[in-house]
Structure formats: C-alpha cells, structure tokens
Amino acid sequence: MEAFNTVTAIVAPLDRANVDTDAIIPKQFLKSIKRSGFGPNLFDEWRYLDQGQPGKSNEGRPLNKDFVLNLPRYAGARILLARDNFGCGSSREHAPWALQDFGFRVIIAPSFADIFFNNCFKNGILPIVQEASVVDSLFAEVAAQPGYQLTVDLPAQRITTPSGRSIAFEVDPFRKHCLIHGLDDIGLTLQHVADIQAYESKHKGQAPWAFLD
C-alpha cells in the first residue's frame, strides 16, 4: 500500500448526500477480486450516458458532460469533497478500490458509512470527518475558485486551504500509523513473520496435524 504523508491536490466536489457503494462502483463490475482496474468505472452510471460492462473499453462511450469528474477544471483531482453518509449501502470493498484506482487519496465529508470508512483506511484512502458547516464552506470555496487545491497533512492532522486557513481533523492513532507507513492488513502481518515462525516451530511438536505442509 502506498504510504500517505502529505497530499496537495485539486478538490472535486460531489454535492450529493447518501452516495451508496452501488453508485461508486455498480454491481456488474464486482466479479473481479483484484484491487486494480476499477478506476475507469468509478461512478460509472453518473459519468456515462450508457451502461458500462465489465471487460469492455470505455473508449467511445458517451460522457455525461455535467458530471463533476468529467469537468476539465477537476481533472487530476485527488481529494473528493462529499456530503453526509458517503459510502452507504452494501459493504463491497470494491468501492474504495475504485476510488483509490481513480486517484483519490482523501475524502472529506460530514459523515461516512461505518464499513466503508474502515475499508478506506485498509486501501490507502484517508476519510476525514468534518462538521457540516466546514464542509459547506469548502464547497463554496471550490465553486468560487477554479483549480482549488487543499493540502492535507496527515502527520500534523491539518487541512490547509489556499487562503491559509488551517482546519484540524481527528484520526485514530493506529490507523494514522498504518497510513503513514503504507501498511495494510498483509503488511501488518508481515511485520510479525519472525514471531509467527517461532510460534509454528514451538507448536509443531505438540499439534503436528495443525501444520500440514
């Protein structure tokens, strides 16, 4: 998993509440269990005017020119500004996979669905909860300033706006550690390989049936 320290990037405003995981990545794309390759179909039913199909190129598909991610001013955005209850619906981990594969590293919203919130941390995305009034002010600033960027400093737990306004945010210390060091569940386990091997060596004689080669 890519380590997270500080991100300075364009902000894309998705001004909709209750965005569910089926909107983030529609159900027909869930056949793959690889983490990569979902970005082109992120928000597929909103980005395109026809229905996408797994395994088919998006080249030539008619775009919804009014959708935020199709607007030139938000090209290359890595920070997503959202509304309440982002990531609700089914627990599919494909949703953060699609967001990460598209390029997003940060999502700022007043609230998130619990499972989606947890899955973001496991996939290198920092979900930041802010008061609705703060989110409202950021939406207004993004709308007023083309090319609007935020700097998100995870070690300092600070968001900095173009005007220099500093906004603090909370993050669980363990999750912060994992993001800064690029540790997903597998990475965390691999940090304890020596302990795991020592345990196996100690217990093989007592329960050899549990350690079949």
Swiss-Prot record:
One of its GO terms (molecular function) is 3-isopropylmalate dehydratase activity. InterPro entries: 3-IsopropMal_deHydase_ssu (IPR004431), Aconitase/3IPM_dehydase_swvl (IPR015928), AconitaseA/IPMdHydase_ssu_swvl (IPR000573), IPMI_Swivel (IPR033940), LeuD (IPR050075). One of its GO terms (biological process) is L-leucine biosynthetic process. It catalyses: (2R,3S)-3-isopropylmalate = (2S)-2-isopropylmalate. Keywords: Amino-acid biosynthesis, Branched-chain amino acid biosynthesis, Leucine biosynthesis, Lyase. SUPFAM superfamilies: LeuD/IlvD-like. Catalyzes the isomerization between 2-isopropylmalate and 3-isopropylmalate, via the formation of 2-isopropylmaleate. This is 3-isopropylmalate dehydratase small subunit. It comes from Magnetococcus marinus (strain ATCC BAA-1437 / JCM 17883 / MC-1).
